[in-house]
């Protein structure tokens, strides 16, 4: 179902909202502004439960938490808002101190075109011009959301560029499987990660070390444990909690994530073609508006952002995990979120 708001976005036109529903009654909603995943209501014990943090539609252009947004041209941080590519120093717009986060004034702040819409899917597309936020090359990207009959949402990202460039797309949804409307403490959830290595960062979120093995650290989620169990230990102290990338093991073959509600009545499995996963426990969510006009607290939701590693354009040793897109080559990644 396609509808539009009675009020306008910053570009002077109404927001376009698309709602999909499957035979189980699961209902998801998306928006053309930021190609945003607005809502996900999952059947649990004969009721529909909202599992995504969200705010009122007219708050999306101004809030600072990227709720449900499609993020690009480069998700995560690029140190000092610059990198070298093919012998040329590329200078980017900075939007987090001296660094660039999530592509600067990025794809989350644009109106995407509704390219195609069907009973169980919607495809958004966007053109990013050469020099957009400092990035080289014209880029055409698309994001396709599909709601399946087994209560999964699959997100597919595709892109083409006419110059070598940095390209790393993700979705910035925050999950809370217990109470996404008010935002109960997500650290009460249980988390399992199919990941052996994580990437330490400094207090500005910039990598400051090679990849580390998770063994004997608070980043070892290979056996499911409550998120709160080892919270704020070790390398987490620099970032007020988890805000780190993990290298995931063959994530397309088996889930890289299993997130379970505190009571165990709902779980989320994540599979992806991406090499890495940023786990962010909402350490700075305080003050973000809710759908009912109240404010979320810190740790109200967890973002599970499938992507390549942060600051990859400045680290050739990580570029085998993605991050640099060659001119004329096809960019394609997918992630599937399954509720059960």
From Swiss-Prot:
Active-site residues (renumbered): 172 (proton donor), 305 (proton acceptor)
Effect on the protein of changing residue 46 to G: In strain: RM 7004
Gene Ontology biological process: galactose catabolic process via UDP-galactose, Leloir pathway; glucose metabolic process
Any Pfam family matching the protein: Aldose_epim
Residues holding substrate: 77, 243
Pathway: Carbohydrate metabolism; hexose metabolism
Assigned EC number: 5.1.3.3
InterPro entries: Ald1_epimerase_CS, Ald_epimerase_bac, Aldose_1-epimerase, Aldose_1/G6P_1-epimerase, Gal_mutarotase_sf_dom, Galactose_mutarotase-like, GH-type_carb-bd
Catalytic reaction list: alpha-D-glucose = beta-D-glucose
Recorded GO CC terms: cytoplasm
GO molecular function: aldose 1-epimerase activity; carbohydrate binding
Keywords: Carbohydrate metabolism, Cytoplasm, Isomerase
Keyword Glycosyltransferase annotated: no
Principal location: cytoplasm
Family matches, as PANTHER family: ALDOSE-1-EPIMERASE (PTHR10091), GALACTOSE MUTAROTASE (PTHR10091:SF0)
Family statement drawn from the similarity comment of this UniProt entry: Belongs to the aldose epimerase family.
UniProt-recorded name of the protein: Aldose 1-epimerase
Encoding gene (name): galM
């Amino acid at each position: 179902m396609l509808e539009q708001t009675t009020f306008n976005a910053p570009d002077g036109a109404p927001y376009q909202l698309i709602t999909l529903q499957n035979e189980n009654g699961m209902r998801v909603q998306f928006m053309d502004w930021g190609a945003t995943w607005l809502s996900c209501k999952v059947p649990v014990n004969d009721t529909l439960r909202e599992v995504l943090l969200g705010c009122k539609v007219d708050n999306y252009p101004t809030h600072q938490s990227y709720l449900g947004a499609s993020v690009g041209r480069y998700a995560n941080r690029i140190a000092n808002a610059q990198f070298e590519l093919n012998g040329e120093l590329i200078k980017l717009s900075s939007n987090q101190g001296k660094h660039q986060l999530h592509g600067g004034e990025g794809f989350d702040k644009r109106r995407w075109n509704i390219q195609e819409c069907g009973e169980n899917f919607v495809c958004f597309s966007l053109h990013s011009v050469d020099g957009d936020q400092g990035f080289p090359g014209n880029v055409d990207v698309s994001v396709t959301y599909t709601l399946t009959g087994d209560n999964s949402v699959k997100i597919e990202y595709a892109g083409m560029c006419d110059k070598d460039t940095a390209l790393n797309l993700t979705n910035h949804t925050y999950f809370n499987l217990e109470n996404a409307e008010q935002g109960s403490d997500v650290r009460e959830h249980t988390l399992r990660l199919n990941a052996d290595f994580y990437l330490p960062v400094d207090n500005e979120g910039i990598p400051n070390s090679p990849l580390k093995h998770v063994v004997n650290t608070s980043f070892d989620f290979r056996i499911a444990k409550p998120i709160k169990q080892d919270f704020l230990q070790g390398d987490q102290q620099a970032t007020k909690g988890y805000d780190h990338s993990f290298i995931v093991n063959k994530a397309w073959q088996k889930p890289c994530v299993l997130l379970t509600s505190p009571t165990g009545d709902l779980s989320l499995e994540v599979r992806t073609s991406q090499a890495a996963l940023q786990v962010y426990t909402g350490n700075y969510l305080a003050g973000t508006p809710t759908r009912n006009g109240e404010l979320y607290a810190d740790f109200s939701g967890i973002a599970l952002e499938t992507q390549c590693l942060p600051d990859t354009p400045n680290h050739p040793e990580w570029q085998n995990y993605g991050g640099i897109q060659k001119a004329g080559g096809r960019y394609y990644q997918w992630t599937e979120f399954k509720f059960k």
